[in-house]
Amino acid sequence: MTPLCPRPALCYHFLTSLLRSAMQNARGARQRAEAAVLSGPGPPLGRAAQHGIPRPLSSAGRLSQGCRGASTVGAAGWKGELPKAGGSPAPGPETPAISPSKRARPAEVGGMQLRFARLSEHATAPTRGSARAAGYDLYSAYDYTIPPMEKAVVKTDIQIALPSGCYGRVAPRSGLAAKHFIDVGAGVIDEDYRGNVGVVLFNFGKEKFEVKKGDRIAQLICERIFYPEIEEVQALDDTERGSGGFGSTGKN
C-alpha cells in the first residue's frame, strides 16, 4: 500500500503552517472589520452585534441632531440652540415684555396738573378765559342771593388736588368787583385740602346780588409756596428799617 505522502513529517509541518496562516488572516480581517465599525457609520445590527460589539454613536452631527430633538420635545418653548464649547449659555425661554404702563407704580403725589373731581351733577369744570390767563374761573353750583353788606359761602361742588408745592389763591373777578362791589374773602386753599371748594363772597354794594347756577364767581390761581421749618432764637439780626411800620417809609 502506497502512502498518500511519501514524507509524512514534511506534510505535517506544511499543513500546520497553512492552518496557522489561515487563522492569522481571519484574525486580521476581524480586527479590520471592528476598526471599520468604530470609525465608520457601522452596519445595522448584524455581524458586529453578533460578536458582542456595541454600536457606537455614528457622528457628531447625529449627536447634535439628537440633542436638538431632545430640547424641542423635552423643553417646549425653549428658544435658541445649545451653547458651543467655550461659548455663553444658551438663552432660556423668552419672557413676554411688560409694558411700562402696566408695571406697578407708587401712588402719584402732586405733579404739575391741577386735578379736580365733581361732587355732584351741578358742578362745572374750572376754565381759563385765555391761554395766558393767570387764574381758572370757578363756577357756582347753586343759586344764591347776597343782601347788601352781607356775605355768602358759594359752593362749587368740586374738590381739587393742587400741583405739588403750590397753594390755591382764590381771587375776585375784576368784572364783579368793578360793577357790583363783589369781593372775595378767605381765599387760601391748602395743598392737602380735599373738601368741597367754597368761595366766600362779600357784597359791598347797596343792592342785593343774585348768583345763578353756572355763574363765574371767582378765579383760582396756583402759586408756589415754601414750607420753612420753625426755629426759635433769643434775638433777631437788626436791619436798617428796624421796627418801622405803617407809614414809616413815607406818606404817599
From Swiss-Prot:
It catalyses: dUTP + H2O = dUMP + diphosphate + H(+). Keywords: Diabetes mellitus, Disease variant, Hydrolase, Magnesium, Mitochondrion, Nucleotide metabolism, Nucleus, Phosphoprotein, Transit peptide. The modification Phosphoserine is found at residues 88, 99. Changing residue 99 to A: Loss of phosphorylation. CDD domains: trimeric_dUTPase. Found in a variety of tissues. Isoform 3 expression is constitutive, while isoform 2 expression correlates with the onset of DNA replication (at protein level). Isoform 2 degradation coincides with the cessation of nuclear DNA replication (at protein level). It is linked to Bone marrow failure and diabetes mellitus syndrome: A form of bone marrow failure syndrome, a heterogeneous group of life-threatening disorders characterized by hematopoietic defects in association with a range of variable extra-hematopoietic manifestations. BMFDMS is an autosomal recessive form characterized by various degrees of bone marrow failure, ranging from dyserythropoiesis to bone marrow aplasia, with onset in infancy or early childhood, and non-autoimmune insulin-dependent diabetes mellitus appearing in the first or second decades. This is Deoxyuridine 5'-triphosphate nucleotidohydrolase, mitochondrial.
